[in-house]
């Protein structure tokens, strides 16, 4: 099963919409609740990163395994450090941009791969086995 979700940068009112839809699908497939929670946390973090840091992104989900593609921070090593954030003061005032997005994504999936090209974007692939 494959699904594509467009994510609009800066639109915090819709942040979490794609991850919520994926959660519903996985619940219908009777995915183990503990695994489901990990997947949804990782998806939500990826989605919020797009909203907070990019103009737009695409979440491509393939069930078994789950794969997600989004646009994120170009400096991957720095971005993986807990607490690092490029979020604007406005984003931080809304409660986002704590610098935990990528570390939380890594903790909540079985495999995380990040490919990035400056001025072109970043592809994040998360795989979780259930």
Segments from the language model and where they lie:
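Short acidic amphipathic alpha-helix that forms the conserved interface helix of the HATPase_c
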Residues: 40-44, 48
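Bergerat-fold GHKL ATPase/HATPase_c domain
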Residues: 1-41
